[in-house]
C-alpha cells in the first residue's frame, strides 16, 4: 500500500492581480487532472491572516509533475509579488487514527482509511 502525500502551501496573502488568478487557475486545473491527485483543501487561520492550501496525492510522481509544470515554475518566480510570506510542507501520511466517524473527504478515497478502519490504532507522523 502506498501512503498519501500532503503538499501544504501555507502563506500570508499579499496583493493578487489578473496574472496571479490566471496562473492559479491553471495550476489547480493541472493538479486536479493528475492521475495521483486525491483532493485539495483550503484553510484560513481564525484571524484571517494566513491561508493553507493542502493538496493530497497518491504518489510522489504526481507531486514531481506538479513541481515541474511550467505555469507553476512561473508562479514560483513571482512569489514575492503576490505573498507577504510562505512556507511549503511536503509530508508523507503514513498513519492516521480516529473513531471512524469523521467524514473527511480525502480519507474517504484513501487506501490509508481502509487500512486503518479495521480497528488498529496508530500514530500520526
Give each language-model segment a name.
Residues 1-51, 62-65, 84-125:
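Short S/T/G/P-rich N-terminal loop/turn motif that feeds into the first structured element of a domain
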Residues 56, 60-89:
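An amphipathic, aromatic/His-enriched active-site/gating alpha helix that lines ligand/cofactor pockets
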